[in-house]
């Protein structure tokens, strides 16, 4: 895990524990918490993830930017916070959501439409 990813993850933990803040971690990364368990991760000026402690859900979105940095941040968030170890891969300029079937352990891919929701891992 890269340093910025671990900083983002630490701020998410604080936000899910209902601490309110608006923290700029680098010139392009920002984490905002509303103090009620909802945390937003922002890359440049685009929201790429929303984690909600009340619904136990993580929603990831690319905001229309399919860049290496966006994919890297989303994959880091998914590996740390989403159940089932989903990830984003790219083949021939198309992004795919890769999920592991819990029964067969087969990896299944479907095209990423710019927004996807997953249940949160147990984080408390």
Model segments located where?
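Terminal leader/tail segments of proteins
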Residues: 1-124
């Amino acid at each position: 895990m890269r340093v910025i990813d671990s900083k983002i993850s630490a701020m998410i933990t604080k936000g899910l524990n209902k601490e309110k803040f608006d923290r700029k971690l680098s010139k392009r990364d920002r984490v905002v918490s509303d103090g009620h368990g909802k945390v937003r991760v922002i890359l440049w000026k685009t929201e790429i993830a929303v984690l909600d402690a009340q619904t136990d859900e993580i929603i990831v979105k690319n905001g229309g930017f399919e860049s290496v940095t966006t994919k890297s941040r989303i994959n880091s968030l998914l590996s740390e916070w989403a159940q089932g170890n989903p990830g984003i891969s790219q083949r021939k300029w198309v992004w795919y959501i890769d999920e592991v079937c819990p029964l067969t352990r087969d990896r299944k891919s479907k095209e990423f439409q710019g927004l996807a929701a997953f249940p949160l891992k147990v984080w408390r």
